[in-house]
Curated annotation (Swiss-Prot):
<comment type="function">
    <text>Converts GTP to 7,8-dihydroneopterin triphosphate.</text>
</comment>
<comment type="pathway">
    <text>Cofactor biosynthesis; 7,8-dihydroneopterin triphosphate biosynthesis; 7,8-dihydroneopterin triphosphate from GTP: step 1/1.</text>
</comment>
<dbReference type="GO" id="GO:0046654">
    <property type="term" value="P:tetrahydrofolate biosynthetic process"/>
</dbReference>
<dbReference type="InterPro" id="IPR022838">
    <property type="entry name" value="GTP_cyclohydrolase_FolE2"/>
</dbReference>
<dbReference type="InterPro" id="IPR003801">
    <property type="entry name" value="GTP_cyclohydrolase_FolE2/MptA"/>
</dbReference>
<protein>
    <recommendedName>
        <fullName>GTP cyclohydrolase FolE2</fullName>
        <ecNumber>3.5.4.16</ecNumber>
    </recommendedName>
</protein>
<comment type="similarity">
    <text>Belongs to the GTP cyclohydrolase IV family.</text>
</comment>
<dbReference type="GO" id="GO:0003934">
    <property type="term" value="F:GTP cyclohydrolase I activity"/>
</dbReference>
<dbReference type="Pfam" id="PF02649">
    <property type="entry name" value="GCHY-1"/>
</dbReference>
<keyword id="KW-0378">Hydrolase</keyword>
<feature type="site" description="May be catalytically important">
    <location>
        <position position="183"/>
    </location>
</feature>
Length: 301
């Protein structure tokens, strides 16, 4: 045990005690224009690369939410292609551009993401730019009987790829939301009651060029919740809980039922060109989960 008072050396001496050493007198240049630029030195580096960049970048953003906007925290992946005769890209330009957009009051929309990806490619002097942005989207949910409201959230994402040589852009959007599912088999064979579980519905859709006015977050949310046994709620009083319990019993769903019903809704949405749907149920009477998936391309039919 240490004894008090303790006589301490200066902070500089303490750092030396624990291994700090003074900087050496270097011989390499400290001015940027005199430094060797390894990334841009031309040479045959064997292969061109599809994507080079940074991921897991946390940043505050403002998103478009219907007729309003919403502030949230997003996770970015930013990348560009890389030609064969360049060793790498200047990655600092990626976060530099993100900070520039943020300081200019950027509102995230499908159109502004396409412009962002195009500018990434141009800054890097590459032909392709890509980005993925993920964030929690918050929305208000009212209880079914009392009308009491609270906030819900869904995980959403947008992925953009732009080719500056062909001027082509692809855009896909996705959403994951939790729902209630009640087992049809349990309801059918039991004298009373039925087991239910929390289902995780994940949807991803490729959008057509004419999808500018498509409120994709709300449409995907509705596709999942309207086909579930019951949606989730942040606030439920006893009259609400009774309503939700009975609603689930009236609408039993297997995971297979969920993905087929959601697929039917997405198929009817003209702005969607192709889609992926997955439902995963955390089973209450098993240790394992139940899953079902479907991938469908309307243009390939």
């Amino acid at each position: 045990m240490s004894t008090y008072p303790v006589t301490l050396p200066t902070k500089e001496e303490r750092h030396k005690l624990f291994g700090s050493v003074p900087p050496i007198k270097g011989t390499k240049p400290t001015e940027k224009d005199k430094m060797i630029d390894l990334q841009n030195t031309p040479k045959n580096f064997l292969f061109a690369l599809d994507a080079v960049g940074i991921s897991n970048v946390k940043h505050p953003v403002v998103i478009q939410d219907g007729e309003t906007t919403q502030a949230t925290i997003a996770t970015f992946e930013l990348s560009t292609s890389l030609v064969q005769d360049r060793k790498g890209i200047n990655m600092s330009r990626l976060t530099e551009q993100l900070d520039q957009y943020h300081n200019e009051g950027w509102v995230v929309t499908n159109e502004s993401l396409i412009q962002f990806a195009r500018e990434l490619a141009e800054r890097m002097e590459q032909s392709e730019g890509q980005l993925t942005i993920r964030y929690p989207w918050f929305f208000t949910r009212k209880a079914p009987a009392t009308g009491l409201s609270g906030l819900m959230n869904a995980e959403v994402w947008q992925t953009v790829s732009v080719n500056t040589e062909t001027n082509e852009a692809t855009l896909s959007v996705g959403l994951t939301i939790n729902v209630t599912t009640l087992c049809p088999c349990s309801k059918e064979i039991s004298e009373y009651s039925a087991h239910n579980q929390r289902g995780y519905v994940t949807m991803e859709a490729s959008l057509r060029d004419e999808a500018d006015d498509f409120n994709w977050k709300q449409e995907l949310l509705d596709a999942a919740e309207s086909n579930a046994s019951a949606p989730l709620h942040p606030v439920l009083k006893r009259p609400d809980e009774k309503r939700v319990t009975e609603m689930a019993y009236e609408n039993p769903r297997f995971v297979e039922d969920m993905v087929r019903l959601i697929a039917a809704d997405l198929y009817e949405m003209d702005p969607i060109a192709s889609f992926f749907v997955e439902c995963r149920n955390e089973e209450t009477i098993h240790q394992h989960d139940a899953i079902a998936r479907i991938t469908f391309d309307k243009d390939a039919q």
